[in-house]
């Protein structure tokens, strides 16, 4: 049985839920999976895992620090493993004019995934750019004020509040499809 490790960092919970959705798919595909919140559980070794997936939420253009530290700590070993990276962020569903959306998504993929892999000299088998969660209830007063202009744009784009102050822009079917593709890639290479 192929062993997989999913390590993530989250601010509002979207990346945690996304990591669990990815793990569920991998388990159905026959993988033995361990899911780790990098803030709560420090991974000591990755030697037993054939596949490692690292994910982060994005806020103010930055990864959460814990998965970044994981990439740094295990950089040499990750370069020899089957690795996939993903982020959950608003840039996966830009709230701009149609002609801007593709460019913004390409910019996000480059900045948050390709440049992150290059920074640590990694060659992932897959990169995933997924929507995120806007949880106005958990945001600081300043950030909530800054993001207040986003609420009407979310609704214009078809994203409704799933709970008071909570907008989820993730596409769980796309996330599951991505995880299934990662599983197929890893299976075909083993």
Question: Residue ranges of each PLM-predicted region?
Answer:
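Alpha-helix C-terminal capping/helix-to-coil transition sites in glycosyltransferase folds
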Residues: 47-48
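Short, glycine/serine-rich, charged loops/turns that create anion-binding
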Residues: 11-12, 40, 90, 134
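A short glycine-rich beta-strand->turn/loop micro-motif centered on a GG-aromatic cluster
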Residues: 32-42
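N-terminal beta1-alpha1 ligand-phosphate binding loop
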Residues: 2-31
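FMN-binding flavodoxin-like domain, especially the glycine-rich phosphate-binding loop
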Residues: 29, 34, 51, 59-190
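A generic structural signal for ordered secondary structure
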Residues: 1-5, 36, 183
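Short, well-ordered alpha-helical microsegments
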Residues: 42-43, 63
